[in-house]
Amino acid sequence: MIDRGWAIVATDYPGMGTAGRYPYLIGVGEGQATLDGLRALCQVDDAHASNRVMLWGHSQGGHATLWAAQIAADYAPDLDVVGVAALSSATDPLAVSKLIIEGPASALVNAVTSYVVVPYADEYPDLTLIGLTHPAGSVFADAAASRCATDPGTLVSLLVTLGLGGRDHLYDLDLDAGPVHDRLAQNIATAIVPAPLFLGQGVDDEVVSIDIQRTTDARVCAAGRPVETHEYPGRDHLGVIAQGSPLIDDLFV
């Protein structure tokens, strides 16, 4: 990409080794962090970066990308968003949470659930770290809040150390009604963005259901917005962006 004349910036979210709350699947926080990074890049003289930007991201990054595009006109009117690409995007945090939490219990499921519960409890006053079903649950929640959410192995090890091996769900969350449901729904990305949209996902995605992308595509088409949607049979959540994936050529053609 650099050889083709692109300048690249990767999002540095608040709370990831710096002060602030980590906005995991919290749309406005993710979107603002993404746009802040682009604005900073435009101020680096040696980068020779213009204000014409392409937004793209995978998984949580796809969610952040869509929210960045949605709020760009108001939050960063100095940026000219010319294209948006969301890959295997966690566009609907409520649907993603249901897929993960309503499945069989495991240490990894409990760890991943904490990635959502802890930031949401930090962000929203109507949510607290309640509903923990194990006496050591509060200890785990406190420890999880101080660890990098991109390191599931660390959190799984912590669960095992605490004797929370995953035979039971650590959290008791009502995803059909109430404040947890409402806050997750509040952070669904509409994907109605002011630039051409590219959606791409593996059909065999085990983390984000392909149905989420299909629903997003239908919503964007109904709104009359330009969208190019690709599905990749035989590709899972990470495989769709692996070296040799046909998505790469489709994205940069």
What residues fall within each predicted segment?
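Conserved alpha/beta-hydrolase
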Residues: 1-18
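Alpha/beta-hydrolase active-site loop
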Residues: 24-46
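Primarily recognizes the serine-hydrolase "nucleophile elbow" in alpha/beta-hydrolase
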Residues: 40-109
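Short alpha-helix in the alpha/beta-hydrolase fold that links the catalytic acid
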Residues: 68, 195-197, 209-219
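Accessory cap/linker subdomain of secreted extracellular hydrolases
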Residues: 87-189
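C-terminal catalytic histidine-bearing segment of alpha/beta-hydrolase fold enzymes
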Residues: 172, 176, 181-184, 214-253
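Short beta-strand/loop motif that positions the catalytic acidic residue
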Residues: 193, 198-205
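Acidic catalytic loop of the alpha/beta-hydrolase fold
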Residues: 203-211, 238
